[in-house]
Amino acid sequence: MRPEIRKAEGSPGPASGRPRPRWYRWLAKPSARLVSTSVLAAAAIIFATPASGGMAARFVKAVGFGPSPSQNGASFGGTPAVGALFTTSNGHLGTHFCTASVVNSPHGNLLLTAAHCVVGTQGTIAFVPGYANGQAPYQIWNVSRIFTDQAWNNSASVDDDVAFLEVSRNGGAPIEDVTGAEQLGIGLPPVELTRVIGYPNGAPEPVVCQNWTKAFSPNQLEFDCGGYPDGTSGGPFLIRVDHATGQGTVMGVIGGYQQGGDSPTVSYSAMFGSNVRALYESAVARS
């Protein structure tokens, strides 16, 4: 039987998936050892061109999206590797306030979201993959650690509005074994046919839309599609989606400029470059 989510009354937490800018400093040592190449080779990271030395690059075959690009998002029943972030209080779930996705990693325990989503949460959040209509078909996973870039910690840099989250194991199995995972795309072209998934605040189901991304600025992506209000922050920009699994390569998350956009019809993301790669390596090393 799939667990049903019972919300706690008056749970504290972020008032919005795209809150007003607030500086946040993750209280951990900024320095971290880099993970070895042999360990990182176990994780699939998609690059625009093969890396010379360092981390091994692996490529996936592009899979067609099927339907044509759209201008408006539509609700759907969800997909296993994308879910909602919930506040927690005294062991009970509160409301969902942002979106996250499972990303491939050697330990199978990392999520990807926007850094502004975890401002002030102090780790009191949980992830519900595939959440829809009050159900948790792939269990509830507590977030145990948060990893953000020092540039974000220091000044809330819009180009570093990215966070990796470590989740605790449930019954010994890592989350990736349960849900599958998206691949992490680094340095990919800004113009891609892209599927974006997000959980609007208070909505029983996620929304999905696909359209062409474009470069808004040298370090920011733009995605034009309606239906992405507060709560969709952290939602993945997915390309090369496999219709059989619903999984693909994530090249961005709703965030960055205007913390993802002041209008529900236009969403933004920081482009994933060397900064995101370094943050991922650090998260893998410490998770």
Each predicted region: which residue ranges?
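Loop/turn elements at helix/coil->beta-strand transitions in domains of secreted/extracellular proteins
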Residues: 80-82, 107-109, 190-194, 219, ...
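Protease-domain processing segments flanking chymotrypsin-fold serine proteases, especially trypsin-like
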Residues: 2-105, 278-287
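Chymotrypsin/trypsin-fold serine protease catalytic domain
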Residues: 143, 158-231
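Catalytic histidine site
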Residues: 75-132, 212-217, 225, 269
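Conserved catalytic-core segment of clan PA serine endopeptidases
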Residues: 68-80, 87-89, 104, 125-172
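Acidic glycine-/aspartate-rich tracts in secreted/extracellular proteins
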Residues: 117-118, 131-134, 169-172, 201-202, ...
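Catalytic nucleophile loop of clan PA
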Residues: 227-253
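C-terminal cap/linker of serine protease catalytic domains
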Residues: 251, 257-287
